Amino acid sequence: MSFFTMCVLAAGIGMALGTLGTGIGQGLAVKSAVEGVSRNPGASGKILTTMMIGLAMIESLAIYALVVCLIILFANPYKDIALELAKTVAK
């Protein structure tokens, strides 16, 4: 398996796991917020504000995963080393 194949697989798996965790976390956060509003409708403003801030924090995980995956794909610092090694092996 080549270096670039492994990079693509790592980026795909990393993004999948990052978004899976984000989706589960956001679902649990919204579930808890809806339960809180159903128990105390008067506090819906505070609950909504806190939930939005929490969702923004949770969403940052997906953004960080995307950035790391893009770095792995397009700005990999080991790309030159892998190309040199491939040229050496091919000779």
Swiss-Prot record:
It is a multi-pass membrane protein. It is found in: Cell inner membrane. Pfam families: ATP-synt_C. SUPFAM superfamilies: F1F0 ATP synthase subunit C. F-type ATPases have 2 components, F(1) - the catalytic core - and F(0) - the membrane proton channel. F(1) has five subunits: alpha(3), beta(3), gamma(1), delta(1), epsilon(1). F(0) has three main subunits: a(1), b(2) and c(10-14). The alpha and beta chains form an alternating ring which encloses part of the gamma chain. F(1) is attached to F(0) by a central stalk formed by the gamma and epsilon chains, while a peripheral stalk is formed by the delta and b chains. Belongs to the ATPase C chain family. This is ATP synthase subunit c. One of its GO terms (molecular function) is proton-transporting ATP synthase activity, rotational mechanism. CDD domains: ATP-synt_Fo_c. F(1)F(0) ATP synthase produces ATP from ADP in the presence of a proton or sodium gradient. F-type ATPases consist of two structural domains, F(1) containing the extramembraneous catalytic core and F(0) containing the membrane proton channel, linked together by a central stalk and a peripheral stalk. During catalysis, ATP synthesis in the catalytic domain of F(1) is coupled via a rotary mechanism of the central stalk subunits to proton translocation. Its main location: membrane. Keywords: ATP synthesis, Cell inner membrane, Cell membrane, CF(0), Hydrogen ion transport, Ion transport, Lipid-binding, Membrane, Transmembrane, Transmembrane helix, Transport. It comes from Geotalea daltonii (strain DSM 22248 / JCM 15807 / FRC-32). PANTHER family: ATP SYNTHASE LIPID-BINDING PROTEIN, MITOCHONDRIAL, ATPASE PROTEIN 9. The keyword Transmembrane helix applies.
